Design a protein with these regions (language model features):
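Signature for phosphate-centric chemistry
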Residues: 21-155, 159-329, 333-425
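Phosphate-group recognition and catalysis centered on beta-loop-alpha active-site segments
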Residues: 425-672
Length: 672
């Protein structure tokens, strides 16, 4: 979230035709930039403080609590080499007396940018501190009832990155100066970072990269105007700077950090407006496709905001119920989690579902996600009603939630908002049966990789134990005439899957699992000929999940080195004995019984924490789904491929659906 998704040097190698300046279409985004060209910075655009306007609350309702998520304030970027490139190339041109007055001016401005950057990437600038101080002051005077008449306690947590911590200090410091009797609880740490600033998703990034790579090829750049603007002899300048697009991109990078460094000049004036539009477009489309509810990735992106949403809801409910007394919960993080949050809520404008091309024309990036972007949820109550209302402010502007009916203006029933959030994304998850093997071999490394790339919650695969004790991945016990369980690994390994892969081992499979921590490995342990063989299979599987020992670690750090994240796995089996043994030996893992002949209550009493039954079982015993959930157990239905059955299992509320058709299941689960 801190660095841009794409290296611009690679971008310019893959762009389309270089031509003279083209006409710029009249779109909402273009009009937005013409109104204020500095907005072309997108997520490095400094905050615009606009006049505050409030719609009156329903009669008798007063604010009593604020839930807030704020992006850090203006910071330096990661463009040091770009700033130096512009400065040094123009300095060489100056030595050859090639600069126009505009070129000379740009040379000096780029030098200032480079000096202010000072090799410090991602550092909060003084402007960033001022932004949060001003936001705090505006919040304080806008909702005085929350701070002056209510509880004096404020809880604030921050991402672990310094620019967020300093932003938090700037915000809370101003509140303290305005009202010294406020009581602050400030904190930061990895457990907060996990939901404040959840990491990127490699599957989403790869899909976005492919879409943008194709889009770049359609772009036509003006490569002539910049030479006429900056140089007295364009032909000589071309010898010095042969790649006009890369050079202009470096100028664009200088321009987009002028606001954070309080440079008043509009540095975009050195570039053709059409090129500014395209640089801006490529910059924000990456964020939109990766972080918002786009038609390309929305179904993958929104679930990643759920933990943050759930945290904010639980904090608010604790205050509403009286269990906790607080005036406000303040959270300081980053742009990408912020975008995921406001899109999950479905706030008007920012959460529109667009294709790449539609977003390029219509999505207003710096309006939604400048530096210090913020969401404020203002809670209201009345002495005459138990109904709590909430108003959403996005960058201090009242925001509507089109999916819900408002009580009045931008005021919504909190219970309606919670219900909307509860149903915003499907609670039923997709498990690819034997991997996503359409076009691949079942139970192959390729099918696992495809399930990961598709964004499946989990990928199921089958494990047999060879005669010499090696766990291998294959559905049937036999490969032709070869019985896996009575054959040596060497003989099993000699066989090839339909796609040419050798029969994989569990260790090889888990190696691919480790490359994508988002997708659960659903390990089906096949029944063996004896209980002793089943115990051996359990032992070998648990061994495969142990992290590799750290090497060359000083003794005093040995305990820390062993604290590695456990593998994200689910165990399933038709063998009741295997499930019992797994539950006994690995109580921290999810274990699901497959046979379908035992009621949830009995399994729960044995310590087995899940059921994974054929969907036909749930037609006979639909009550088992709720029974399992009441006991805190998970419920999976297998193997569900037809629309009617998928809809039925979804409506029953199963937690996972195992399927050979992940595309159809996703389509049905996300029907909007």
């Amino acid at each position: 979230m801190m660095k841009r998704f794409f290296t611009w040097a690679l971008l310019v190698l893959s762009v389309g035709t270089a031509v003279a300046q083209n006409a710029v279409p009249d779109t909402p985004v273009v009009r937005f930039l013409r109104e204020n060209p500095r907005r072309a910075a997108f997520n490095t655009h400094s905050y615009e403080f606009l006049p505050i306007q409030d719609t009156p609350a329903p009669k008798g309702y007063k604010p009593f609590y604020i839930s807030h998520y704020g992006r850090h304030g203006s910071r330096s970027d990661w463009g040091g080499p770009q700033y130096r490139l512009v400065r040094d190339l123009l300095a060489k041109a100056s030595e050859q007396h090639l600069l126009t007055p505009a070129g000379d001016s740009l040379m000096h401005e780029a030098a200032v940018i480079y000096e202010l950057h000072n090799g410090m990437d991602g550092r909060l600038t003084p402007r960033g501190v001022r932004e949060h101080a001003q936001l705090a002051e505006r919040m304080y005077h806008r909702f005085p009832e929350v701070f002056r008449k209510g509880c004096k306690h404020i809880r604030a947590v921050s991402s672990t990155t310094p620019r967020c911590i300093v932003s938090m200090n700037g915000f809370t410091g101003r509140l303290m100066s305005l009202q010294p009797d406020l009581d602050f609880d400030l904190d930061t740490g990895e457990k907060y970072y996990a939901y404040i600033a959840r990491g990127e998703n490699s599957t989403i990034s790869a899909r976005t990269g492919q879409a943008l790579a194709a889009y770049r090829k359609t772009i036509q750049w003006d490569t002539e105007t910049v030479y006429r603007t900056l140089f007295t002899d364009p032909a000589e300048a071309r010898k010095l700077i042969p790649d006009a697009v890369a050079f202009q991109n470096a100028i664009y990078d200088c321009a987009r950090v002028s606001d954070p460094f309080d440079i008043p000049d509009n540095m975009y004036r050195y570039l053709p407006f059409g090129n500014v539009v395209k640089f801006h477009e490529l910059n924000f489309l990456s964020a939109y496709l990766n972080q918002c509810d786009s038609k390309l990735n929305g179904e993958l992106r929104l679930p990643r905001a759920q933990e943050l949403i759930d945290t904010l809801i639980s904090q608010a409910d604790a205050v509403i119920s009286g269990k906790v007394r607080k005036a406000a919960d303040l959270c300081f993080g980053h742009d990408w989690p912020y975008l995921g949050l406001v899109c999950y809520l479905g706030l008007e404008g920012v959460s529109e579902r667009y294709t790449l091309e539609e977003a390029a024309d219509n999505w207003l990036p710096s309006w939604y996600c400048p530096f210090a972007a913020n969401l404020q949820m203002i809670f209201y109550r009345s002495k005459k009603s138990d109904e709590v209302l909430v108003k959403f402010l996005m960058n201090e502007r009242e925001a509507k939630l089109p999916a819900l009916e408002a009580v009045q203006g931008p005021y919504y029933r909190w219970n309606d908002v919670k219900a909307w959030c509860e149903n915003r994304i499907p609670r039923t998850q997709i498990v690819a049966h034997r991997g996503y093997w359409d076009g691949n071999a079942e139970n192959s490394i390729a099918s696992l990789r495809k399930a990961q790339e598709f964004g499946c919650w989990g990928s199921e695969f089958d494990i047999h134990l060879t005669a010499d004790g090696v766990p291998v991945i294959h559905h049937d016990r036999h490969i032709g005439e070869l019985d896996i369980q009575t054959s040596a690994f060497e003989d099993v390994r000699a066989n090839r899957l339909a796609n040419g892969e050798p029969v994989p081992t569990l260790a090889e499979y888990m190696g691919q699992v480790a490359r994508n921590r988002e997708c659960m490995a659903v390990l089906e342990l096949k029944p063996q000929s004896t209980a002793e063989r089943e115990d051996e299979l359990v032992e070998k599987c648990l061994q495969a999940l142990q992290p590799a020992p750290a090497r060359n670690v000083p003794p005093e750090f040995a305990a820390f080195a062993r604290r590695q994240e456990p593998a994200k796995v689910v165990f399933i089996s038709f063998s009741h004995h295997i499930c019992q043994e797994l539950s006994r030996r690995a109580p921290g893992y999810m274990v699901q019984y497959l046979e379908g002949d035992i009621a949830p209550a009995q399994l729960h009493a044995e310590g087995i924490n899940g059921i994974d039954y054929h969907y036909s079982v749930f037609y006979k015993h639909p009550e088992w789904v709720q029974e399992a959930h009441d006991l805190g157990m998970t419920v999976n239905a297998w193997t569900v491929d037809d629309r009617k059955d998928i809809e039925a299992m979804r409506d029953l509320g199963v937690d996972q659906i195992t399927t050979n058709n992940p595309v159809l299941v996703r389509e049905i689960l996300w029907e909007r």
